[in-house]
């Protein structure tokens, strides 16, 4: 496994539409800082920004999820480019590897299966689902707990 200082992850998904720039973004920094932002202007909603530090065991689990996904073996050259529907970006530094992916928003597995690289895009799709689930859980748990 890579050292903590050799790890960084950032994910962004968003679009510019009738409600302005709406997006979800999160990043894990080498020191364990999790930064989360969710901006929706729907019904005049406000931007949600949260920051928290996660334990090194969470960082190790994050690295394991990425390693298990084998995303570092993929290439986004044949993936759908960002369009008016939106864009997704995933940047990962793990050890001496630095990878970055950009594609359009993916609505469902139908979009994945109809792409020019369904196998590679499927890896990305499921990894992003796992990462979002982890981040939503961490943010939800961290900010719902009331100290005694």
Swiss-Prot record:
> Which residues are annotated as modified residue N-acetylalanine in the UniProt record?
2
Identify a single GO molecular function assigned to this protein. Answer: RNA binding
**CDD domains associated with the record:** Mago_nashi (cd11295)
Record's keyword terms, sorted: Acetylation, mRNA processing, mRNA splicing, mRNA transport, Nucleus, RNA-binding, Spliceosome, Transport
Subcellular location(s) per record: Nucleus
**A cellular component annotation (GO) from this entry:** nucleus
One GO BP annotation is: mRNA transport
Identify the InterPro entries for this entry. Answer: Mago_nashi, Mago_nashi_sf
What job does this protein perform?
Answer: Required for pre-mRNA splicing as component of the spliceosome. Plays a redundant role with MAGOH in the exon junction complex and in the nonsense-mediated decay (NMD) pathway.
Q: How does it assemble?
A: Component of the pre-catalytic, catalytic and post-catalytic spliceosome complexes. Heterodimer with RBM8A. Core component of the mRNA splicing-dependent exon junction complex (EJC); the core complex contains CASC3, EIF4A3, MAGOH or MAGOHB, and RBM8A.
- Family classification: Belongs to the mago nashi family.
Q: What is this protein called?
A: Protein mago nashi homolog 2
Native species: Bos taurus (Bovine)
Q: Which gene encodes it?
A: MAGOHB
């Amino acid at each position: 496994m890579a050292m903590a200082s050799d790890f960084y992850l950032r994910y962004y998904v968003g679009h510019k539409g009738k409600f302005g720039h709406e997006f979800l973004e999160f990043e894990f920094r080498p020191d364990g800082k999790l930064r989360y932002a969710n901006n929706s202007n729907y019904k005049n909603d406000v931007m949600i920004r949260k920051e928290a530090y996660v334990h090194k065991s969470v960082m190790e689990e994050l690295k394991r999820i990425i390693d298990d996904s084998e995303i570092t073996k993929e290439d986004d050259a044949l993936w759908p480019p960002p369009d008016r529907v939106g864009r997704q970006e995933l940047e990962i530094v793990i050890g001496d590897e630095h990878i970055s992916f950009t594609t359009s928003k993916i609505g469902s597995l139908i979009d994945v299966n109809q792409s020019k690289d369904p196998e590679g895009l499927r890896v990305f799709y499921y990894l992003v689902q796992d990462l979002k689930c982890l981040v939503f859980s961490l943010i939800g748990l961290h900010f719902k707990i009331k100290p005694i």
